[in-house]
Amino acid sequence: MHLMYFTEQPMSAYPEDAVGEDGTTALLFSNEHFDSVAGSRLYNERLIEYRLAEEVGFDGIMLNEHHDAPFCMQAQITVWASVLAAATERIKIVLLGTPLPTLDNPLQAAESLAMVDMISKGRLVAGIVRGSGTEQYANNVNPAFNRERFYEAHDLLVKAWTEPGPWRWEGPNYEFRVVNPWATPLQKPHPRIWVPGVASPETIVWCAQQRYPYVCLNTTIEMTKQIWELYEKSANEAGYESGPEHRGYLLRVHVQDTEEKAIANAREYMWMQGEFTGLGHPVWSSPTGYGSPANREPTLKRINQRADAPQAMPFEEQLEHLQIVAGTPDQVVERLRVLLEETRPGILALWGNDGKVSHEDSKRCIELMGSDVLPALREIGDELDLRDPFEVGAPLSTQFMEAPRIPEGAPA
């Protein structure tokens, strides 16, 4: 089982009384409230924590990207990826992911990701995403073309990595007279591609058709099972049998020496949930054209005041339903066993620290995960035969039916 560490890198150093009446801080909360000293401290503390995650035995560090909001300080995912490529030695650098449809020039992503893969000596997982509705506004992109731009940018990215140039690209959204990137990834034919999401049926089906792992982002156990059912059905229709190596799961998990302290820190996830989801503006989160009509219906009802806005599940209920797992190492392992037995992912990302959890508590959480939780999870993974794509040598994709390889003579 592939075990990753994740944090949104949220920034809480702003005057909360400056937030508008609707409570949202995404997109239109003025950056006059940004504190660059606090921002510098945050980045450097996160780097210490990432290095610690490698030291204690995590297999990967998961990174993501958001814009114009304090809930996520990762505005450029490839910047952090390049930092980790140089600052770490062993751990996989897992991007979940590069928001392809927001890019007017996907070839720049192809080049920068290739550089990260070479600097890291082949440790990149080049995950891709559509980007949330809010990201379309932040990047000045028409949301109506998001999905088709996602598919086309993906095809262009893969071709740029694998087909020698120069050649011309003429598509409905992108046109390039010359495609001939000199730098291509170290991994051949290209790095693995994983796709995260929150249950969009179209994306799940597409992932299964491509043989890409789909990583569920903190979905409920029941929703996760429904996702796997759709993935498995789509995989069967594509002519193969899916397994744990195609299933990923991101879950909020916080560990401390005492249950009392773990629960107190885990309550900070609710601050994060308010920043990100509970107070997300419905118009910005789901702009016209971004989602399918069926997926957009609940949002339209809220906008037109024909339905109440969804409220975050109370903290205690999230603990009960394993949406949040917090406690001592033994308590956390016991609860994660239930989740692993129910959902059977080969890829598990532990969303360890967020909100206003201190740097020292974050480090202690990572240390306890490494000493007690990760070894127990590996034993459970072996017991349940939860193999990840690297362990089974899973095919890269439907297009490339082999595992990525690092050429002979590459630096060790």
Name every feature range the model reports, one short phrase each.
Residues 199-223, 227-228, 232:
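A conserved active-site cap/scaffold subdomain adjacent to cofactor or substrate pockets
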Residues 4-34, 147-182, 223-345, 374, ...:
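An alpha-helical appendage that flanks or caps ligand/catalytic pockets
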Residues 3-7, 61-63, 93-96, 124-128, ...:
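Hydrophobic faces of well-ordered beta-strands that scaffold small-molecule active sites
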Residues 60-80, 100, 137, 219, ...:
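Glycine-rich, proline-tolerant flexible connector loops at the mouths of alpha/beta enzymes
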